[in-house]
Amino acid sequence: MPTSVLELKSVDRHYVQGQNTLTILKAADFTLAPGEMVALVAPSGTGKSTLLHIAGLLEHPDGGDVIVNGQPCAGLADDRRTEIRRKEIGFVYQFHHLLPEFTAIENVMMPQLIAGLSPAEARERAGQLLAYMKLGSRTEHRPSELSGGEQQRVAIARAVANAPLVLLADEPTGNLDPVTAGYVFEALEAIVRHSGLAALIATHNEELAARMDRRVTLSDGRVVELPAK
């Protein structure tokens, strides 16, 4: 396995607004090692979501490269980028984006079925993940029947269902009250550590950020290491 599972090399991203060009990322470099949890702590509007979208191959940079598990992705066709993303990267967002017509276990099965697992295999793994997330008694409930914290734990289980190498999370506890946020982060941390994933987690919560292996921020379009707390 490469020494890094995710690397951004001199990544640029800008947006044109009328006659103005807004620079979001400028020669941004970042490396995520296997098994580490990194907090991305920065104010709103500084480019956290853009960085995560580029790192997760959801958005193309204007310059530089993203390397996933040793594979440079600059210049790859979109179908190849999608293949890498589905195999290597899981996503968790502030809002769960669960499919409302499906049960918890069906939501966790979905990415596995897309990846080619049989329904029986997908159901077994989904059940194991939900049990690990302490949702074993809630597998047949639809999202509307679950609390906000339960919904987010289902979303975390779904994100790791295909055993990715990298988990990218954009304010995963941002829509929750402090107590529930703590429970959800504990579940997220437990499954990341248990699975040996590498995780980059954007958060405003300094207390949660301090529990990760290191913290970075965005400054003038670049990724900057923050001192340990």
Swiss-Prot record:
- Enzyme kind, highest EC tier: translocase
* Places the protein is found: Cell inner membrane
Provide the E.C. number(s) assigned to this enzyme. 7.6.2.-
Instruction: Give the UniProt keywords, A-Z.
Output: ATP-binding, Cell inner membrane, Cell membrane, Membrane, Nucleotide-binding, Translocase, Transport
Q: Which residues bind ATP?
A: A42, P43, S44, G45, T46, G47, K48, S49
The main location is: membrane
Entry-linked SMART domains: AAA (SM00382)
Decide whether keyword Acetylation is in the record. no
What's one GO MF term for it?
Answer: ATP binding
Annotated GO biological process: lipoprotein localization to outer membrane; protein localization to outer membrane
Superkingdom of the organism of origin: Bacteria
Q: How does it sit in the membrane?
A: Peripheral membrane protein
Task: Tell me the ranges covered by the ABC transporter domain, including all copies.
Answer: 6-226
- CDD domains per record: ABC_MJ0796_LolCDE_FtsE
Gene3D superfamilies, per database record:
P-loop containing nucleotide triphosphate hydrolases
Would you name any one GO CC term? plasma membrane
Subunit and interaction comment:
The complex is composed of two ATP-binding proteins (LolD) and two transmembrane proteins (LolC and LolE).
Write out the function statement from the record: Part of the ABC transporter complex LolCDE involved in the translocation of mature outer membrane-directed lipoproteins, from the inner membrane to the periplasmic chaperone, LolA. Responsible for the formation of the LolA-lipoprotein complex in an ATP-dependent manner.
Per the similarity annotation, which family is this?
A: Belongs to the ABC transporter superfamily. Lipoprotein translocase (TC 3.A.1.125) family.
Protein name (database record) = Lipoprotein-releasing system ATP-binding protein LolD
